[in-house]
């Protein structure tokens, strides 16, 4: 028994605390960079279709889905080998997508067609196409899977979609050029970032009414350069980290008061981000500088820059 405990202890010590990978889409190189979260080095680069942007994994992490925007396809890759298994029908110019909690349906924003396409990933067939506003991009799904959100950049709206009927039941105005959306607090709130508006709007999911709005101000940075795009919540949902685009900073927001507590300097044109497995570090994609900044979450400071491909865009964690 003692020997067994010793072996288990030695095995636990051998496993890195941050073991896992961050997968990054490089939209100008048509590649994916895979970063080891223990060594903080790129360990693999895989070829994709043209202009990869959105990226997400299946629930069991056996498949990775990639929005190959200029190939007009969502590609399905085997993450163990980097092999493209097949393409899914996606509509034209897929930007972002969200995987339904059933792990079977992808909801895809089609920028050129002003629709949201619903694809069954098993049958590889389009289930529905839902008319939304002009230039849809951001996608979110409620934790219970009953509501999907599409944001439209030109119409400046968040569109609320009933997943049971694939119909719109509400449209809410936001500031100029909404880019990203996320549900929080068990689905009670919806947050939407507006790139040109320089804000994040918070909605009550039950009523679609506005609960609050946050703006950002960085000393020495012109307001026109402060452009919120992607954001991520800490597991306890006390804080949100917000990528501010060409402002080259990430804002730390108190998710209870909607107040900005701090700004962290990162690479140039920070776009999206992903936490590692224990949420101790945050990895940001910086398009213009072609790198990923590693943020120590507890210390709220950047600790390393990792060079990847040209114009990194999306990021996703794989254990």
Q: Where would I find each of the regions flagged by the language model?
A:
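Predominantly soluble domains enriched in secretory-pathway, periplasmic, or organellar proteins
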Residues: 12, 16-319
């Amino acid at each position: 028994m003692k020997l067994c405990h010793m072996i288990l202890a030695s095995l636990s010590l051998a496993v890195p605390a941050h073991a896992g990978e961050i997968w990054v889409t490089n939209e100008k190189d048509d590649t994916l960079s895979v970063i080891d979260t223990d060594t903080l080095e790129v360990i693999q680069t895989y070829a994709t279709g043209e202009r990869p942007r959105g990226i997400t994994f299946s629930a069991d992490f056996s498949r990775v889905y990639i929005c190959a925007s200029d190939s007009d396809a969502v590609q399905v890759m085997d993450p163990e080998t980097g092999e493209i298994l097949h393409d899914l029908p996606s509509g034209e110019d897929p930007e972002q997508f969200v995987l339904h909690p059933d792990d079977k349906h992808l909801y895809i924003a089609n920028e050129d067609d002003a629709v949201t396409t619903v694809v069954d990933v098993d049958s590889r067939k389009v289930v529905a196409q839902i008319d939304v506003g002009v230039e849809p991009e951001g996608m979110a799904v409620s934790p219970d899977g009953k509501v999907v959100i599409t944001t439209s950049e030109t119409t400046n709206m968040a569109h609320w979609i009933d997943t049971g009927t694939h119909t719109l039941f509400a449209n809410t105005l936001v500031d100029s050029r909404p880019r990203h959306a996320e549900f929080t607090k068990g689905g009670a709130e919806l947050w939407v970032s507006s790139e040109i508006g320089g804000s994040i709007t918070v909605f009550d999911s039950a009523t679609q009414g506005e609960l609050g709005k946050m703006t950002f101000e960085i000393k020495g940075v012109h307001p026109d350069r402060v452009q919120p795009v992607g954001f991520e919540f800490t597991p306890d949902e006390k804080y949100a980290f917000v990528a501010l685009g060409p402002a080259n900073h990430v804002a730390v927001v108190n998710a209870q008061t909607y107040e900005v507590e701090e700004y962290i300097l990162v690479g140039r044109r920070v776009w999206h981000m992903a936490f590692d497995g224990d949420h101790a570090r945050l990895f940001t994609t910086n398009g213009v500088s072609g790198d990923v900044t590693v943020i120590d979450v507890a210390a709220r400071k950047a600790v390393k820059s990792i060079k990847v491909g040209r114009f990194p865009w999306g990021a996703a964690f794989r254990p």
